[in-house]
Structures are given as structure tokens and as C-alpha cells.
Amino acid sequence: MSKGAVLIISGPSGCGKSTLTKSLIESIPNVYFSISTTTRPMREGETDGVHYHFVSKEHFLQDIHNNVFLEWAEVHTNFYGTSLKPVQQALEQDKIVLFDVDVQGHHSIKEYFGDFAKSVFITTKNKDILRERLISRQTDDLQTIEFRLIQAHNEMQHIHNFDYLIINDDITTAKEAMVAIARSLKYQQIERLSKIIQKW
């Protein structure tokens, strides 16, 4: 895997992943955002093929059978997956492939790419702030929000498996940190090449 780079973003619902992802794509033109496939209902303001590829459960299960996905998982009773072929094509074009996945997806992608993939865990300063953000989104009922907070607590136990941590308490600072991490990936590539030359 000599071309491109892989950056994985994970974090609890409501931490600001979508905002930071959009900002990164706007700041670095060579970023390819891997659009996940999902069986969950489309939310207001979302577009098929832009935010997600929305499919039926039957379609998703058939894709699993056909080994379409690099990784897939069932989250909050819905299925999410990452198609492998477009990722491979983007890497061949020397792009930075950006993933926005849950902790389980992070582990699967890391297992596939190894040290070639770098990862960022994004979270809020504390659980109360996360709860406020989830409520302000007005996309979930209170029961779902409490369930998401439990999931967030579980996800926080995996922080040590990530290369970077961003506490998103100031959106401007968080955006700058994301861009700096993404730009550093090319330097890490040079470091890998240097090691190869030394061995040669």
C-alpha cells in the first residue's frame, strides 16, 4: 500500500463528527470521503449518495453475502457498512481516504490496513455537553438519547486504541486540529519510505 493515506474518525453521536468531516473536505482537496451504506431511515436534510447510500435491509444482507464491504456492523438496530472497491480506487489515485465510522468499524478498518491507517477519536468535554447537543439536534426522542449516552460511555473505553484524541469544546480549534492531522499523513508516508530505503 504505497499510495494514498487512510484516516478514520470515530466518536459518539453528537460530538461533531459531521461538522469536522465537512470542514476537512473543504480544507484539503485531496480528501476522498468514504460514504457508508446504511439501512436506517433518511433524515430531513440528507441526500442519498451524499450523506449515506440508503438501502433496504435485504439489499444490505445481499451485499454482505457478496463480500462487498470492507467492514459492516449493526448499530442501534440499523446496519452500516463501508464498500471496499471505491476505497481501493481512491487510494490508487493517491487520495486521503476519510472514514466516519463507529468504534467497531474503526477496529475492522485498522485490522485491514494496519499501521497504514491513522485514527482520531472525537468527543465532548463531558457527558452533560453531549446530552445537550443530542437534545438540540431534535432528531431523537429522550429514550434514544439516553441509549446513545450509554453507547458513548462504552465507546469512550476504546480511546486508547486511537492515534489521536480531539475534545471538541471549541469548533474552530477542533477544525484546525483535524486539518493538521490530515496534512501530517503525507509526512508519515515519507517516514515509511525512509525506513524502506534504510533496509535496502
Curated annotation (Swiss-Prot):
**Enzyme class name:** transferase
Q: Which reaction does it catalyse?
A: GMP + ATP = GDP + ADP
**What CDD domains does its record include?**
GMPK
Q: Which residues form the Guanylate kinase-like domain?
A: 4-183
Enzyme Commission number(s): 2.7.4.8
The answer to whether keyword Transcription applies is: no
The GO molecular function terms of this record are: ATP binding; guanylate kinase activity
Q: Which SMART domains match?
A: GuKc
The alphabetized UniProt keywords are: ATP-binding, Cytoplasm, Kinase, Nucleotide-binding, Transferase
Q: Disulfide bonds, which pairs? A: none
Q: Where found?
A: Cytoplasm
Summarize where ATP binds, as residue positions: G11, P12, S13, G14, C15, G16, K17, S18
Provide the family line: Belongs to the guanylate kinase family.
Role according to the record: Essential for recycling GMP and indirectly, cGMP.
State the PANTHER family in the record. GUANYLATE KINASE, GUANYLATE KINASE-RELATED
Name the chain's protein.
Guanylate kinase
